[in-house]
């Protein structure tokens, strides 16, 4: 076998790939022959090259142009040399006067004038700008020994504090009592006059006792009506009587005021004073009760403006009554101070014997619908609101105070519970999708099915709107989209099949 194999190796071609099937690509195959048309013949290239004649006209023109340029340069040099010789002859004849004139003309001729330079850099040479220079020891000693010399143009008075015109204004303090007296002249009754003149001596001891009683009653009202801070940052004023229940389960009774007068449509400037030393109250805003008191008379009480500095810096006070009146079936929404721009309508009603059924109210001006929470639009929502626990009602009040309606908040609370953050996220997403033009019912379906993916919610809403326009039922559309994971083609086929089957 070995000899036979060797013999084949030496005496003939032998391939190990014989009888082995394999496939060769098209690019390795021999290309097909191309048939030339009849009578086609290639010209003889050598003959064509021999017959070609080149005239070298461009090269000859380039040589001529170079010769012309050289002749022009030689003529210019010859003219310059002749002019220099003529100037030298004139200088030798004129003597030193001619030399000075020529030198002056040379230095001041526009051709030889140096270009303009910045005066700051005029004394510097460009090569020596970055070259370090040694400081002479004598100059150093002189600097050390000699006192610092002030320049003539330096005046220390320029840097001293000049008289500020606002300093005089700060020294002029405002007499708060006098300002209030000027504002309330002709509109206030005995109570404000007694309050403002409480520090002045009285001859009658009975009037002094009456002043002290008035001040004590107002201070008690200040303490009783101090805002109650909620954990969520809102402040709600306490309620009056037993016809309204407070959100924090506390009731306040106001001591009777002997004489009260009518104060209407007053706006007061902001007066800065120390609360510890001043007993003057600033009348800033009012609140009213929409339910009647036990005696049948309606009172609008003055709200003291003494607040803690931290609360003033916060700026997010909420003024108003509790959000729900369960006994009388009426609702008084809480209003934030930011929602009442420059509103200082003060109304103090005198005690009158009016029927219990009639109760006058004070309506604030310039309130928009978005600023004041509205009543539940349907009786079912109102019944649901009454059935809530105190904590759930407190949660609803908090979200409603932010501007949402009771219906939306109750629906969101059913889906998200009492977590305010989740309720706000749900309401925000719902509002955004509704603003884009989608049906609120479809938006609720999308939020229920795809809570975490905004992209899937948008796709789901677009497909639902499209299939709804085609005439399919919402129930079938929802089932099909949920089954096929928002696949439009498969969902459409399934809907068509269901429509044909029905």
Swiss-Prot record:
SUPFAM superfamilies: UBA-like (SSF46934)
A biological-process GO annotation: protein transport
Chief place where the protein resides: cytoplasm
Pfam family, one: UBA_9
Region named Disordered: 77-120, 135-156
InterPro entries: UBA (IPR015940), UBA-like_sf (IPR009060), UBAP-1-like_UBA2 (IPR049467), UBAP1 (IPR038870), UBAP1_C (IPR042575), UMA (IPR023340)
Phosphoserine PTM positions: 146, 205, 289
Keywords, sorted A to Z: Cytoplasm, Endosome, Phosphoprotein, Protein transport, Repeat, Transport
GO CC aspect terms: cytosol; ESCRT I complex; plasma membrane
Biased composition (Basic and acidic residues): 78-100
Region called Interaction with ESCRT-I, residue ranges: 1-95
Chain residue ranges for the region called Interaction with PTPN23: 260-290
Domain UBA, first and last residues per copy: 389-430, 451-498
GO terms, molecular function: ubiquitin binding
Ranges where the UMA domain occurs: 17-63
Domain notes for this protein: The UMA domain mediates association with the ESCRT-I complex.
Quaternary organization: Component of an ESCRT-I complex (endosomal sorting complex required for transport I) which consists of TSG101, VPS28, VPS37A and UBAP1 in a 1:1:1:1 stoichiometry. Interacts with PTPN23. Interacts (via UBA domains) with ubiquitinated proteins.
Name this polypeptide is given: Ubiquitin-associated protein 1
């Amino acid at each position: 076998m070995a000899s036979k194999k060797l013999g084949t190796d030496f005496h003939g071609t032998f391939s190990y790939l014989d009888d082995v099937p394999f496939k060769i690509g098209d690019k390795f195959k021999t290309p097909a022959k191309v048939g030339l048309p009849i009578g086609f013949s290639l010209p003889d290239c050598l003959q064509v090259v021999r017959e070609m004649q080149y005239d070298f006209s461009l090269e000859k023109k380039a040589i001529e142009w170079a010769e012309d340029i050289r002749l022009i340069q030689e003529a210019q040099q010859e003219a310059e040399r002749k002019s220099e010789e003529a100037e030298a002859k004139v200088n030798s004849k004129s003597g030193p006067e001619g030399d000075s004139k020529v030198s002056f003309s040379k230095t001041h001729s526009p051709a030889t004038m140096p270009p303009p330079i910045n005066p700051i850099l005029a004394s510097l040479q460009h090569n020596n700008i970055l070259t370090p220079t040694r400081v002479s020891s004598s100059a150093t000693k002189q600097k050390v020994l000699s006192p610092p010399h002030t320049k003539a143009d330096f005046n220390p008075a320029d840097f001293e504090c000049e008289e500020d015109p606002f300093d005089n204004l700060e020294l002029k303090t405002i007499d708060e009592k006098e300002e209030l007296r000027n504002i309330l002249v002709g509109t206030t009754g005995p109570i404000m006059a007694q309050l403002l003149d409480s520090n002045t001596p009285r001859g009658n001891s009975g009037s002094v006792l009456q002043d002290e009683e008035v001040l004590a009653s107002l201070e008690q009202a200040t303490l009783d009506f101090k805002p109650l801070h909620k954990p969520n940052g809102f402040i709600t004023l306490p309620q009056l009587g037993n016809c309204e229940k407070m959100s924090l389960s506390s009731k306040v009774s106001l001591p009777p005021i002997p004489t009260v007068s009518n104060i209407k449509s007053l706006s007061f400037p902001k007066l800065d004073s120390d609360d510890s030393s001043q007993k003057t109250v600033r009348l800033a805003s009012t609140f009213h009760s929409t339910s009647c008191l036990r005696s049948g008379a309606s009172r609008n009480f003055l709200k003291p403006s003494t607040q803690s500095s931290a609360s003033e810096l916060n700026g997010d006070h909420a003024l108003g009554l509790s959000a729900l009146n369960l006994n009388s079936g009426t609702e008084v929404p809480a209003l934030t101070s930011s929602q009442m721009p420059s509103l200082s309508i003060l109304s103090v009603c005198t005690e009158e014997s009016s029927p219990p059924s009639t109760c006058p109210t004070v309506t604030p001006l310039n309130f928009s619908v978005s600023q004041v929470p509205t009543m539940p639009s349907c009786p079912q929502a109102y019944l649901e609101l009454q059935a809530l626990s105190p904590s759930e009602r407190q949660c609803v009040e908090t979200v409603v105070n932010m501007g949402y309606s009771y219906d939306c908040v109750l629906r969101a609370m059913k889906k998200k519970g009492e977590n305010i953050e989740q309720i706000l996220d749900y309401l925000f997403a719902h509002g955004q999708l509704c603003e884009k033009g989608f049906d609120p019912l479809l938006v609720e379906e999308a939020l229920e099915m795809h809570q975490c993916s905004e992209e899937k919610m948008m796709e789901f809403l677009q497909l639902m709107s499209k299939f709804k326009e085609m005439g399919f039922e919402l129930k079938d559309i929802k089932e099909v989209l949920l089954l096929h994971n928002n696949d439009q083609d498969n969902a459409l086929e399934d809907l068509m099949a269901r429509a044909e089957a029905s």
